[in-house]
Amino acid sequence: IDYAMAHGVNYYDTAWPYHRGVSESVVGKALQQYPRESFYLADKMPTYLLPTREQAREIFEKQLEKCKVEYFDYYLLHAIRFVEDYQTVYEKNGVLDYLLEQKKQGRIRNLGWSFYGNTETLEYLLSRDVQWDFAMVQLNYHDMLHEYKIAPHQARFIPKDPAPTQWMFEKMQQSGLPLIVMEPLLGGRLARLNKKALAVLQTERPQASAASWAFRYV
């Protein structure tokens, strides 16, 4: 993180389960030496735990404590896959109302969601009467041109019929909702192209890395 800060990176993303539950604490410790206004911090409500409102409150308070901050710049409903999950956790359990209250109090600056679902789920999310500030979706040049490819570490999370990337991107453009991109390197695979594929790119920009092409795309 020190290297990243020194080279202009100012957006940091963490979550409750990352690195076996220690990511938030590590990120908080690393960032505490820097002025709070010098970086943007994103964290997430663990949808997969199906938390109640009270459990969500406990999780949120613990996240602030672990990250050593008084507010999150970006806060996400983590990994929305199915309509039923969203309805159970965020509507029936009252977790969305709780998070909206935290936003009113200034403890969440921007509220959004990360998406791993099918077309039905995306259309449902966009139809809700909620003033979302942003959404996070998987976007890279491979998925825009070919069938959606699941990164290995995501396999157990993704529905069998994920929304096609091109369709999803067009749907998000129509909604006007700002996007944050995840998986620009497709789990690192677009940074490790075979020699034949890399040679095609190098005919245009010989010194550019495979990773730089992927980042330029998004």
At which residue positions do the language-model features occur?
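A structural motif
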Residues: 9, 69-72, 108, 132
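A short, structured active-site edge motif that brings together acidic residues
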Residues: 37-49, 71, 75-78, 138
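Short, acidic/polar
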Residues: 1-4, 52-68, 117-126, 210-215
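Aromatic/hydrophobic pocket-lining residues that form the small-molecule binding cavity
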Residues: 23, 56, 60, 92-95, ...
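Beta/alpha (TIM)-barrel catalytic core signal, keyed to glycine-rich beta->alpha loops juxtaposed to Asp/Glu
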Residues: 80-218
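N-terminal binding-site loop/beta-alpha segment at the start of enzyme catalytic domains
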Residues: 1-39, 70, 98, 104
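Conserved, mostly hydrophobic/aromatic
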Residues: 4, 12, 27, 41, ...
